[in-house]
Amino acid sequence: MPINLYSKAVFLKSAARVNQLPEDSGYEVAFAGRSNAGKSSALNCLTNNKNLARTSKTPGRTQLINLFSLDEQRRLVDLPGYGYAKVAMEVKLEWQKNLAHYLEARQCLRGLILLMDVRHPLKDLDQILVNWALHRELPVHILLTKADKLSRSEVKNAVLKVRQYYELAEHLVSVQAFSSVKKDGVEELISLLDRWYEWN
C-alpha cells in the first residue's frame, strides 16, 4: 500500500478570489465538483482526517477556495462546489468566473481531480470544467464518487461510459470509481497524486 503523505495536510487559508491565493509556485492539485458530489468527504477520506474539509448537508455551502498545505511546496486546493439550484444566479456566475480564472491562470496547478456522482456523471458544468482544463492541456482525473450506492457491474459500466466519452483525450483524462464510505479507490488516487506532486 502506498504511504499516505496526505494525512499530514493542514488548513492553510481560504480565498474568495484568485488574487488572494498564496504565491503561484510549487505544486497544487485542485479538487472540483458539483455541490453534493462528495468532494469534502473524498478529501477527508484521502487525508484520513474527517474534520479537514467541512461536509455539509446544504449543497453550495463551500463558496471559498480552501487551501491545505502538505509541505512548503505542495498544496491541496478545494474549489467551490458548483451547480446548486438554490444559489442566486449572480453568486453562481461569480463562482464560475473564479473557477475559470483559477484553472486558466494558476501556473503551479499540476492537475484537476473532478468529482462526479457515479449515478449522474457528465453534467453540463462538469463537461465545461473538463474543457477548460483540456484547453490548457491540464491533466484531469475523474473520480466517480458514491460507488457504494450502485452494484459493482453498474459502477464498472459508469466508469466505461465516462472513459469512452473522453477517449479522444485519454492522454489527459483518466477515470476511476471511488467510495469515501468504503474507502474504495483511495490507493489508486494516492498513486496518481504522488505522480502529480512528484514526491521524491
Curated annotation (Swiss-Prot):
Residues annotated as binding GTP? 33-40, 60-64, 78-81, 145-148, 178-180
Any one Gene Ontology biological process term?
A: division septum assembly
Gene3D superfamilies in the record: P-loop containing nucleotide triphosphate hydrolases
**Which CDD domains does this entry report, sorted A to Z?**
YihA_EngB
- Taxonomically, the superkingdom here is Bacteria
* Cofactor list: Mg(2+)
The UniProt keywords, alphabetically, are: Cell cycle, Cell division, GTP-binding, Magnesium, Metal-binding, Nucleotide-binding, Septation
- Per UniProt, where does Mg(2+) bind? S40, T62
Molecular function (GO) terms listed? GTP binding; metal ion binding
Q: Which GO terms describe its cellular component?
A: cytosol
Check the record and name the HAMAP family matching this protein: GTPase_EngB
Q: Record's family?
A: Belongs to the TRAFAC class TrmE-Era-EngA-EngB-Septin-like GTPase superfamily. EngB GTPase family.
Q: What is the protein name for this chain?
A: Probable GTP-binding protein EngB
Q: Which organism is it from?
A: Legionella pneumophila subsp. pneumophila (strain Philadelphia 1 / ATCC 33152 / DSM 7513)
